[in-house]
Amino acid sequence: IYGGDPQELSLLIKPYARRIEISGETLFCYTPDPEQVRAQLRGHRGLRLLERPPNLEDVFLRLTGREMGKYQ
């Protein structure tokens, strides 16, 4: 989810998410029921949502983290 205040949005969708991550202005929400999350976000203008099934990239990011410059 991109747009809006990620902290505020995370509180709104927290009951429907198994895990939430915030990286910069983007909120990553891992949920078994994306429709519940979309329903909570209806009416919030200026949001961009991307929905996709989990894959090996998610496993990699979970193990290594999202920040590239973390270990420099």
From Swiss-Prot:
Keywords: ATP-binding, Cell inner membrane, Cell membrane, Membrane, Nodulation, Nucleotide-binding, Plasmid, Translocase, Transport. One of its GO terms (molecular function) is ATP binding. It comes from the Bacteria. Its EC number is 7.6.2.-. It is a peripheral membrane protein. GO terms for cellular component: plasma membrane. It is found in: Cell inner membrane. It is an enzyme of class 7 (translocase). The complex is composed of two ATP-binding proteins (NodI) and two transmembrane proteins (NodJ). Belongs to the ABC transporter superfamily. Lipooligosaccharide exporter (TC 3.A.1.102) family. Part of the ABC transporter complex NodIJ involved in the export of the nodulation factors (Nod factors), the bacterial signal molecules that induce symbiosis and subsequent nodulation induction. Nod factors are LCO (lipo-chitin oligosaccharide), a modified beta-1,4-linked N-acetylglucosamine oligosaccharide. This subunit is responsible for energy coupling to the transport system. This is Nod factor export ATP-binding protein I.
